[in-house]
Amino acid sequence: MGKPRGIRTARKHVNHRREQRWADKDYKKAHMGTRWKANPFGGASHAKGIVLEKVGVEAKQPNSAIRKCVRVQLIKNGKKVTAFVPRDGCLNHIEENDEVLVAGFGRKGHAVGDIPGVRFKVVKVANVSLLALYKEKKERPRS
């Protein structure tokens, strides 16, 4: 049996197309509402959080390294996430109980590269850009 052809088959075509859209990965992701349910950020691009601890995450094979990360508890909903701290020595600018701004890590909710289970990265510390601290253009505010 092929597809229905003829002058009064529009409803059948429309309904079939509506059903088949759900097989498309991107359509399903956009329309099922999992963006708000499953994503710790609740659909937002960034989120603020409090640093709980500094952690080292071992890189996946064949690489051998300890990637510097922090455990962050998000302010908006209390969820805990692991966020990567980019650049050499930037972990020294972050202390426990600091407020950090966390963003996605580039692969639309997936882990990046050889860092298993880490889907976020730190962008700001105490409302100062981590890049500015790294380049020594700005200093941490005195508390």
Curated annotation (Swiss-Prot):
Record keyword Metal-binding present: no
Superkingdom per UniProt: Eukaryota
Assembly and interaction partners: Component of the 40S small ribosomal subunit.
A GO molecular-function annotation: structural constituent of ribosome
Disordered as annotated region, ranges: 1-21
InterPro entries according to UniProt: NA-bd_OB-fold, Ribosomal_uS12, Ribosomal_uS12_euk/arc
Chain coiled-coil ranges: none
Organism: Papilio dardanus (African swallowtail butterfly)
UniProt protein name: Small ribosomal subunit protein uS12
GO biological process, one term: cytoplasmic translation
Any Gene Ontology CC annotation: rough endoplasmic reticulum
Protein's UniProt keywords contain Nucleotide-binding: no
CDD domains per UniProt: Ribosomal_S23
Keywords tagged on the record: Cytoplasm, Endoplasmic reticulum, Hydroxylation, Ribonucleoprotein, Ribosomal protein
Modified residues (Hydroxyproline): 62
Record PROSITE patterns: RIBOSOMAL_S12
Compartments reported by the entry: Cytoplasm, Cytosol; Cytoplasm; Rough endoplasmic reticulum
Basic residues: compositionally biased ranges: 1-19
Family the entry assigns: Belongs to the universal ribosomal protein uS12 family.
